[in-house]
């Protein structure tokens, strides 16, 4: 039986542009890190340090956790293609977002798991074994004792000017995380999956929260009425081997796609 490993964060890309997904995840063609992706990774590092301190009551301050983010930037700066932001810009933006996350988003949640270590999950669909992997950011618990997942998302368009957080493109990833968390920790995630959005655009970053209800159900579908889930469509693409391109994708740029200059779906002849 064919087995394909799929990282949760890459799953939505398979529907957006399968050709780009194949290049990155099957052919393993790497790309330089962008300044804005470095911001996102650094924010994750600093936020994780702060939230882990909250969970374990070790007393790390927001500013002390910011040091973790800055150290990460210094460590990874040599991997970045500095095209639109300088290292100074990246550090300043990272600290802005870090401060707002720790002061305005984190206190809204009672986290019980930070940077969850989960084993892979194998799901067989239509003769294809899909091995799901990933590291869920958070599990929170509400006042009634119910659990939910949360993921941090940064990016130029992560939050609109009116504070709306884009959630649609994160449904597949959220569904994978719910499956992995429930299997790893033997819990049921009844609450909506939360996207903590933080924009890297503008002088003052926008932040907000978006909710994804029933993410796992949207991923797996409903066998009782033969409703297909997103994972069934992903399996069909894998089974067919038809990794077609999408030249109208928002990520059809040199910055995001490793085959941009040779993609036949853009009229390039290899």
Tell where the protein language model's regions lie, with residue ranges:
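RecB-family 4Fe-4S metal-dependent nuclease core
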Residues: 1-270
